[in-house]
Amino acid sequence: MRPRMKYSNSKISPAKFSSTAGEALVPPCKIRRSQQKTKEFCHVYCMRLRSGLTIRKETSYFRKEPTKRYSLKSGTKHEENFSAYPRDSRKRSLLGSIQAFAASVDTLSIQGTSLLTQSPASLSTYNDQSVSFVLENGCYVINVDDSGKDQEQDQVLLRYYESPCPASQSGDGVDGKKLMVNMSPIKDTDIWLHANDKDYSVELQRGDVSPPEQAFFVLHKKSSDFVSFECKNLPGTYIGVKDNQLALVEEKDESCNNIMFKLSKI
C-alpha cells in the first residue's frame, strides 16, 4: 500500500486578510518640497564722522529659502537650508566682506595715516576771496582774488585722513583723533599743496608716489562754515593769507580771520 500523504490547509480569516492587504496597499510617504526662492541679502556698514562725513559700504550675497521635506519613517517635517555656499563658507564670505570694508577704509596708508574719504570743494577766504590755480609757463600758481558771482570757482580735492593728534572738544575729530587733509587742484590731482618751512610759503609740488609730511594739514573746525589748516610738520603754523597770497602764518590766536577758510560744495 502506498503511504497516505497528509496536507494541511491553513485558512486565513477574511478580517486578517483584509488588514494585511490594506497594509500592502498603503503608499509610502512622498517627499514634498516647497518651491525654492533665491533671496538677496545686503549688509550695509556705515561710519559717521564728527565732521559730518559718512562712509558707507554695501556687501550682498544670495541665499535660498529653507526647504521642507518629510521623513519616510516618522513622517515628521525637517528643514534644510539650501544656499549658494555651504554654512562654513557663508560665514567665511561674511567675514571676508567685513574685512573688505575695513580694507576699503584703509586702502591708502601713507606714512602711518589711513585715507578715510575724499571730496571736491571750492576754497575761499574769510573775506570771500576765492583760491584759484592758474597755469603759467607750464606750472600752476596759487592766486587769491575777488571772484564775481557768475565766475566759476576752482575746486580742490580734499583727502581726509585720521591724524595721530588727539581731538579737542570742538568736535573736529573722529574716534578721539583729529582729521587731517591733503589738498590737490581738481585740474591735476597729482599736485599737492605743500608747506615750505624755509620761506613760510605755500607751494604746489608734484609727487611720484606718496605725499610728504609737508603736504598734510590738521583740520580745525572753527564754526559751521569755516575751518583752518594747521601744518602737520609745524604745529602752531597755519595756512593763511598775506598780500593776496597763501602763506604760512604762525598764529597763537586760532580765531584770527586770516587763517579761516570756507569749503563749499559746487
Swiss-Prot record:
One of its GO terms (cellular component) is chromosome. Its main location: nucleus. One of its GO terms (molecular function) is interleukin-33 receptor binding. The record marks 101-102, 108-109 as: Cleavage. It is found in: Nucleus; Chromosome; Cytoplasm; Cytoplasmic vesicle, Secretory vesicle. Residues 66-108 are annotated as: Interaction with RELA. The full-length protein can be released from cells and is able to signal via the IL1RL1/ST2 receptor. However, proteolytic processing by CELA1, CSTG/cathepsin G and ELANE/neutrophil elastase produces C-terminal peptides that are more active than the unprocessed full-length protein. May also be proteolytically processed by calpains. Proteolytic cleavage mediated by apoptotic caspases including CASP3 and CASP7 results in IL33 inactivation. Keywords: Chromosome, Cytokine, Cytoplasm, Cytoplasmic vesicle, Nucleus, Secreted, Transcription. InterPro entries: IL-33, IL33_C. Intraperitoneal injections of IL-33 induce the expression of IL-4, IL-5, and IL-13 and lead to severe pathological changes in mucosal organs. (Microbial infection) Interacts (in reduced form) with H.polygyrus ARI; the interaction abolishes the interaction with its primary receptor IL1RL1. Forms a 1:1:1 heterotrimeric complex with its primary high-affinity receptor IL1RL1 and the coreceptor IL1RAP. Interacts with cargo receptor TMED10; the interaction mediates the translocation from the cytoplasm into the ERGIC (endoplasmic reticulum-Golgi intermediate compartment) and thereby secretion. Cytokine that binds to and signals through the IL1RL1/ST2 receptor which in turn activates NF-kappa-B and MAPK signaling pathways in target cells. Involved in the maturation of Th2 cells inducing the secretion of T-helper type 2-associated cytokines. Also involved in activation of mast cells, basophils, eosinophils and natural killer cells. Acts as an enhancer of polarization of alternatively activated macrophages. Acts as a chemoattractant for Th2 cells, and may function as an 'alarmin', that amplifies immune responses during tissue injury. In quiescent endothelia the uncleaved form is constitutively and abundantly expressed, and acts as a chromatin-associated nuclear factor with transcriptional repressor properties, it may sequester nuclear NF-kappaB/RELA, lowering expression of its targets. This form is rapidely lost upon angiogenic or pro-inflammatory activation. The homeodomain-like HTH domain mediates nuclear localization and heterochromatin association. This is Interleukin-33. The gene is Il33.
